[in-house]
C-alpha cells in the first residue's frame, strides 16, 4: 500500500460503514482507525477484503480498521476531513441516530469504558516511546562505557540531556492524563489538568522537595495525595460529570465566568475528601495484584497467553493504567515485557507456517510481508493476515507467547525481575534497549531476549506439531 491513504479507499470504507450519517466519532490508536457508529447493522464486514486494510474488529458501537503504525493517524485525519465535508442531516435522521446511539451505550458499556483508555493514552504513546528510547540508549551507553553517575564532561552531559525527557514526562504525566481524561469523559481538558495538579503538590511544609501547596490539611482533615494515575482518572471523570451538571443550570451569560470555577471547587473538595484516599487504596490493590502475578511464573504465562486475544477484541489499551501503577510502585513496567511475548509467539507461528507452506504460495507472500513488522513489535499484520484467519496457528501462537511469559516469570521468581523503563513503548526487538532492572540494563536485556527466543521457538514448535493440521497453507 502507498504511504498515503487514498481518498478512494477511505470513501469506500465510509460507504461500507453506513455513510457519514452512521459515524458517531472518528479517532485512531497506534495501528487502527477507530470509527464510532450509531448502528452496527449497517456495517459491511467485508471491509477487511479491501486492499490496504490489514484487518477489521467490529463491536456493537465501533469499527476498528487496522492500517498499521503511522497510517492509522493519517487515515483518521483524512477521514475526519471527509466527514467534515459530509452533508448536514435533517432532524429526523439525527433523532433516529441518537436513539440508536443510546441503545448502543446501554448494551456495550464495558467496551465503551475500555475504549476511553485509548482516547486518553494513545496521544501520549509517541512521547512514551521517544522518552523511553532516549533513556534506554543513554543507560546502555553509560553501562557499557562505565560512566559514573557523578561524572563530568561532554559525554556525561550528553547522557544526562538524553535522560531529562523521561524525567520531565513522568514528573508531570498526571497533568497530561488529567487533561486528556477530562476531555474523553466529556469535560474541559484544562479543568482536568488543574485537578490532576493537586495530586502533584506537596502538603508537608517541612518537605525539602516538591511544590508546597500552601496548606497541610483540608479544613482540619488530613490530606493524603496518593493514588496518582488511578486517582487522577477518577477525579477527571468526576470533574467532567460535575461540569456537565453545572453547565445545565448555568445561564449562558455566566457560563464562561462561573462554570469552571464551580466545577473546580466541587471536584477539588471531593478529591481531598474521597478520591485521593480511594485512589490510594485502588492503586495499592492493583499494584499488589500485578506485582504478585508478575512474580508468579504461571500468572505470567496466563497473561502472555491471553494478550493476543485482548488485542483482537481491541481492549488491550485497558492495561495502560496498570503500566502506570507499576511504574510508580516498582520504578519500571514489569508487565509490558511479559505481554510482549505474545507477539514473539506469533512470529514463531508465522515462521512455522512459512516453512510448511508451498514455495510459491500466497501464504508465504503474506508471511514475508508481515514478518518484519512482527519482529519489530507490530503484530496486527500477522494477526489479521496470517494466524487469525486460520485459527489453529493463532492458538499455537498464544501458547508460544505463554511459554515466553513463563520464562520471564521464572527468572523473576529466581530473583531477577525486570521491565520496561517507560509506561509504554515498542515491543519486539526494538524494546531491547528499553529494558531495565535493579541489577542494571544488560541483565534485563538478556532476560527479555531470552524470553523472545523461547516464544519464537515454542511458537514454531507448537504450530509445526499442532497448528498446521487441516489448515489452508496455500
UniProtKB/Swiss-Prot annotation:
<protein>
    <recommendedName>
        <fullName>PTS system N-acetylmuramic acid-specific EIIBC component</fullName>
        <ecNumber>2.7.1.192</ecNumber>
    </recommendedName>
</protein>
<feature type="topological domain" description="Periplasmic">
    <location>
        <begin position="415"/>
        <end position="440"/>
    </location>
</feature>
<dbReference type="InterPro" id="IPR001996">
    <property type="entry name" value="PTS_IIB_1"/>
</dbReference>
<feature type="topological domain" description="Cytoplasmic">
    <location>
        <begin position="462"/>
        <end position="474"/>
    </location>
</feature>
<feature type="topological domain" description="Periplasmic">
    <location>
        <begin position="145"/>
        <end position="157"/>
    </location>
</feature>
<feature type="transmembrane region" description="Helical">
    <location>
        <begin position="441"/>
        <end position="461"/>
    </location>
</feature>
<dbReference type="GO" id="GO:0008982">
    <property type="term" value="F:protein-N(PI)-phosphohistidine-sugar phosphotransferase activity"/>
</dbReference>
<keyword id="KW-0813">Transport</keyword>
<dbReference type="GO" id="GO:0005886">
    <property type="term" value="C:plasma membrane"/>
</dbReference>
<keyword id="KW-0808">Transferase</keyword>
<feature type="transmembrane region" description="Helical">
    <location>
        <begin position="335"/>
        <end position="355"/>
    </location>
</feature>
<keyword id="KW-0762">Sugar transport</keyword>
<dbReference type="GO" id="GO:0016301">
    <property type="term" value="F:kinase activity"/>
</dbReference>
<keyword id="KW-1133">Transmembrane helix</keyword>
<dbReference type="GO" id="GO:0009401">
    <property type="term" value="P:phosphoenolpyruvate-dependent sugar phosphotransferase system"/>
</dbReference>
<dbReference type="Pfam" id="PF00367">
    <property type="entry name" value="PTS_EIIB"/>
</dbReference>
<dbReference type="InterPro" id="IPR018113">
    <property type="entry name" value="PTrfase_EIIB_Cys"/>
</dbReference>
<feature type="transmembrane region" description="Helical">
    <location>
        <begin position="394"/>
        <end position="414"/>
    </location>
</feature>
<feature type="active site" description="Phosphocysteine intermediate; for EIIB activity">
    <location>
        <position position="29"/>
    </location>
</feature>
<feature type="transmembrane region" description="Helical">
    <location>
        <begin position="302"/>
        <end position="322"/>
    </location>
</feature>
<keyword id="KW-0472">Membrane</keyword>
<feature type="topological domain" description="Periplasmic">
    <location>
        <begin position="282"/>
        <end position="301"/>
    </location>
</feature>
<feature type="topological domain" description="Cytoplasmic">
    <location>
        <begin position="1"/>
        <end position="123"/>
    </location>
</feature>
<keyword id="KW-0812">Transmembrane</keyword>
<feature type="topological domain" description="Cytoplasmic">
    <location>
        <begin position="239"/>
        <end position="260"/>
    </location>
</feature>
<feature type="domain" description="PTS EIIB type-1">
    <location>
        <begin position="1"/>
        <end position="89"/>
    </location>
</feature>
<dbReference type="InterPro" id="IPR003352">
    <property type="entry name" value="PTS_EIIC"/>
</dbReference>
<feature type="topological domain" description="Periplasmic">
    <location>
        <begin position="202"/>
        <end position="217"/>
    </location>
</feature>
<feature type="transmembrane region" description="Helical">
    <location>
        <begin position="124"/>
        <end position="144"/>
    </location>
</feature>
<feature type="topological domain" description="Periplasmic">
    <location>
        <begin position="356"/>
        <end position="368"/>
    </location>
</feature>
<dbReference type="GO" id="GO:0090588">
    <property type="term" value="F:protein-phosphocysteine-N-acetylmuramate phosphotransferase system transporter activity"/>
</dbReference>
<feature type="transmembrane region" description="Helical">
    <location>
        <begin position="218"/>
        <end position="238"/>
    </location>
</feature>
<keyword id="KW-0598">Phosphotransferase system</keyword>
<feature type="transmembrane region" description="Helical">
    <location>
        <begin position="369"/>
        <end position="389"/>
    </location>
</feature>
<keyword id="KW-1003">Cell membrane</keyword>
<dbReference type="InterPro" id="IPR036878">
    <property type="entry name" value="Glu_permease_IIB"/>
</dbReference>
<keyword id="KW-0997">Cell inner membrane</keyword>
<dbReference type="InterPro" id="IPR050558">
    <property type="entry name" value="PTS_Sugar-Specific_Components"/>
</dbReference>
<comment type="function">
    <text>The phosphoenolpyruvate-dependent sugar phosphotransferase system (sugar PTS), a major carbohydrate active transport system, catalyzes the phosphorylation of incoming sugar substrates concomitantly with their translocation across the cell membrane. This system is involved in N-acetylmuramic acid (MurNAc) transport, yielding cytoplasmic MurNAc-6-P. Is also able to take up anhydro-N-acetylmuramic acid (anhMurNAc), but cannot phosphorylate the carbon 6, probably because of the 1,6-anhydro ring.</text>
</comment>
<dbReference type="Pfam" id="PF02378">
    <property type="entry name" value="PTS_EIIC"/>
</dbReference>
<feature type="topological domain" description="Cytoplasmic">
    <location>
        <begin position="390"/>
        <end position="393"/>
    </location>
</feature>
<feature type="topological domain" description="Cytoplasmic">
    <location>
        <begin position="179"/>
        <end position="180"/>
    </location>
</feature>
Amino acid at each position: 500500500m502507498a504511504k498515503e491513504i487514498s481518498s478512494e479507499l477511505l470513501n469506500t470504507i465510509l460507504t461500507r460503514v453506513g455513510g457519514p450519517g452512521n459515524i458517531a466519532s472518528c479517532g485512531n490508536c497506534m495501528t487502527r482507525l477507530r470509527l464510532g457508529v450509531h448502528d452496527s447493522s449497517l456495517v459491511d464486514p467485508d471491509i477487511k477484503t479491501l486492499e490496504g486494510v490489514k484487518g477489521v474488529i467490529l463491536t456493537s458501537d465501533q469499527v476498528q480498521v487496522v492500517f498499521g503504525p503511522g497510517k492509522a493517524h493519517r487515515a483518521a485525519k483524512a477521514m475526519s476531513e471527509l466527514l467534515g465535508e459530509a452533508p448536514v442531516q435533517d432532524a429526523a435522521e439525527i433523532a433516529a441516530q441518537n436513539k440508536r446511539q443510546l441503545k448502543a451505550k446501554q448494551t456495550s458499556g464495558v467496551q465503551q469504558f475500555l475504549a476511553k483508555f485509548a482516547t486518553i493514552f494513545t496521544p501520549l504513546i509517541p512521547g512514551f516511546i521517544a522518552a523511553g528510547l532516549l533513556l534506554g540508549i543513554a543507560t546502555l551507553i553509560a553501562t557499557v562505557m562505565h560512566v559514573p553517575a557523578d561524572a563530568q564532561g561532554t559525554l556525561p552531559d550528553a547522557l544526562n540531556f538524553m535522560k531529562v525527557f523521561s524525567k520531565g514526562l513522568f514528573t508531570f504525566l498526571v497533568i497530561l492524563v488529567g487533561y486528556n481524561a477530562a476531555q474523553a469523559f466529556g469535560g474541559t481538558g484544562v479543568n482536568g489538568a488543574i485537578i490532576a495538579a493537586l495530586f502533584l503538590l506537596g502538603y508537608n511544609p517541612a518537605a525539602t522537595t516538591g511544590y508546597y501547596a500552601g496548606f497541610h490539611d483540608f479544613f482540619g482533615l488530613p490530606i493524603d495525595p496518593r493514588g496518582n494515575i488511578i486517582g487522577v482518572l477518577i477525579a477527571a471523570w468526576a470533574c467532567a460529570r460535575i461540569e456537565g451538571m453545572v453547565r445545565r443550570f448555568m445561564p449562558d451569560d455566566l457560563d464562561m465566568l462561573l462554570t469552571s470555577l464551580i466545577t473546580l471547587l466541587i471536584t477539588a473538595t471531593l478529591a481531598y475528601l474521597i478520591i485521593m484516599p480511594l485512589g490510594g487504596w485502588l492503586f495499592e490493590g492493583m499494584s499488589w495484584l500485578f506485582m504478585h502475578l508478575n512474580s508468579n511464573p504461571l500468572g505470567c504465562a496466563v497473561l502472555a497467553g491471553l494478550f493476543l486475544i485482548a488485542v483482537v477484541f481491541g481492549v488491550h489499551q485497558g492495561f495502560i493504567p496498570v503500566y502506570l501503577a507499576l511504574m510508580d510502585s516498582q520504578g519500571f513496567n514489569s508487565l509490558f515485557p511479559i505481554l510482549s511475548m505474545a507477539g514473539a509467539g506469533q512470529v514463531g507461528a508465522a515462521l512455522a507456517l512459512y516453512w510448511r507452506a508451498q514455495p510459491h504460495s500466497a501464504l508465504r507472500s503474506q508471511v514475508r510481508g508481515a514478518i518484519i513488522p512482527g519482529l519489530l513489535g507490530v503484530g496486527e499484520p500477522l494477526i489479521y493476515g496470517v494466524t487469525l484467519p486460520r485459527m489453529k496457528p493463532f492458538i499455537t501462537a498464544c501458547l508460544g507467547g505463554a511459554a515466553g511469559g513463563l520464562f520471564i516469570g521464572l527468572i523473576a521468581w529466581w530473583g531477577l525481575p525486570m521491565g520496561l523503563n517507560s509506561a509504554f513503548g515498542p515491543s519486539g526487538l526494538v524494546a531491547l534497549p528499553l529494558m531495565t532492572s535493579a541489577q542494571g540494563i544488560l541483565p534485563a536485556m538478556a532476560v527479555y531476549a531470552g524470553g523472545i527466543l523461547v516464544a519464537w521457538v515454542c511458537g514454531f514448535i507448537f504450530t509445526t506439531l499442532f497448528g498446521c493440521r487441516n489448515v489452508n497453507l496455500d
